């Protein structure tokens, strides 16, 4: 998953952000 805390990391697959 691309989530890190409350944010989404760039360059990752979407994970319901």
UniProtKB/Swiss-Prot annotation:
Q: What is its main location?
A: secreted
- One Gene Ontology term of the molecular function aspect: toxin activity
Site positions per UniProt: Important for binding and activity = 4
Task: Provide the alphabetized UniProt keywords.
Answer: Disulfide bond, Ion channel impairing toxin, Neurotoxin, Secreted, Toxin, Voltage-gated sodium channel impairing toxin
Q: So which tissues is this one expressed in?
A: Expressed by the venom duct.
Asked if Repressor is a keyword of the record, the answer is: no
Q: Where in the cell is it found?
A: Secreted
Q: For this UniProt entry, what's an example GO CC term? A: extracellular region
- Keyword Disulfide bond on entry: yes
Maturation and modification: Contains 3 disulfide bonds. They are not added, since framework IV presents two different connectivities (I-V, II-III, IV-VI and I-III, II-V, IV-VI).
Similarity comment: family membership: Belongs to the conotoxin M superfamily.
Q: What is known of its domains?
A: The cysteine framework is IV (CC-C-C-C-C).
What the protein does comes down to: Mu-conotoxins block voltage-gated sodium channels (Nav). Blocks reversibly sodium channels in molluskan neurons, but has no effect on sodium currents in bovine chromaffin cells or in rat brain synaptosomes. Induces paralysis in bivalve mollusks (Mytilus). No effect are observed on fish (Gambusia) and fly larvae (Sarcophaga). PnIVB is approximately 6 times more potent than PnIVA in blockade of the sodium current in Lymnaea neurons.
Q: What is this protein called?
A: Mu-conotoxin PnIVA
Q: Which organism is it from?
A: Conus pennaceus (Feathered cone)
């Amino acid at each position: 998953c691309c989530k890190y805390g409350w944010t989404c990391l760039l360059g990752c697959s979407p994970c319901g952000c």
